[in-house]
Regions:
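Glycine-rich active-site loop/strand segments that organize a redox cofactor
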Residues: 45-95
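Redox-cofactor binding/interface segments in oxidoreductases and associated redox assembly factors
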Residues: 7, 42, 159-160
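Predominantly flavin-linked oxidoreductase catalytic cores and closely associated redox partners
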Residues: 114-252
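Mobile, glycine/GP-rich and aromatic-enriched active-site lid/loop segments adjacent to catalytic centers
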Residues: 86-114, 118, 226, 241-244
Length: 252
């Protein structure tokens, strides 16, 4: 039996673990936080839009336009929806965004967690992978738990650590270092799907208000991007799907 070590127990890590175990692999999942799927709970404003039905090349912005399609053609929205139905999570379509019927991100987290348990996958919480060493056959992973060092041997390693976008959820950038040690090149990253801060001081007095509107990004009297939908006013500025859609232009 092939052994697969997965670093990170977010949405990608748990899905990879379930897929590998369902295909006969022995799986161990290493997660340095105290629970799995922590960042999932924040997605979609706590409702978790886990896929979308509109997937077109114009939606993906990259110097390598074909890159996303290598993945999407193998695992598309229909397959994602089917996967969650098999786990007991049925989807509702809201303008192309697919949410769990409960409108609770915790439904997604719990479904994935229960499937890990059903498949008896070895999930090790508060366990950090500090280094990976390739061997002639497989890999040696150096781990630390409660200050004690250890080693794990695996035939395959799947790195699912995420970026450094949300350290409080576990996405602290530690995966970049592991990737570099394995010879991968890290492309400089910029915020691409984030809230926007505003200079005006009145936002604190209207924090929590939701309103339908249009948000636009301007530079040198030129509109770079705009989008319409539900805006969420926060104590620091604006959030919501339209803001996320245009935020990458602010980062650039």
């Amino acid at each position: 039996m092939r052994k697969v070590a997965i670093i990170g127990a977010g949405a990608a890590g748990m899905t990879a673990a379930i897929t590998a175990a369902s295909n006969g692999a022995e799986v161990v999942v290493l997660e340095h936080m105290d629970r799995v799927g922590k960042k999932i709970l924040s997605t979609g404003n706590g409702r978790c839009n886990f896929t979308n039905t509109y997937q077109d090349r114009s939606c993906y912005h990259s110097d390598n336009e074909s890159f996303p399609w290598k993945i999407i053609e193998k695992f598309n929205a229909e397959q994602i929806i089917k996967l969650f139905e098999e786990l007991g999570v049925y989807a509702k379509n809201r303008n192309g965004y697919m949410y769990p019927y409960s409108d609770q991100a915790s439904s997604v987290t719990e479904a994935l967690k229960m499937e890990l348990e059903r498949l008896q996958i070895d999930v090790r919480l508060q366990t950090e992978c500090t280094d990976i060493f390739p061997r002639k056959k497989g890999f040696t992973l150096q781990i630390v738990k409660d200050g004690k060092k250890g080693k794990i041997y695996a035939d395959h390693v799947i790195l699912c650590t995420g970026s450094r976008a949300f350290p409080a959820s576990g996405s602290d950038g530690s995966g970049y270092d592991l990737a570099k040690k394995l010879g991968h090149k890290i492309i400089p990253v910029l915020p691409a799907l984030v809230q926007l801060r505003c200079e005006e001081k009145f936002f604190k007095s209207i924090a929590g208000v939701r309103v339908q509107g249009t948000v636009s990004i301007w530079s040198e009297n030129q509109c770079l991007a705009k989008d319409t939908g539900e805006l969420q006013l926060t104590n620091y500025g604006i959030s919501g799907i339209p803001v996320f859609q245009v935020s990458r232009y602010a980062a650039i």
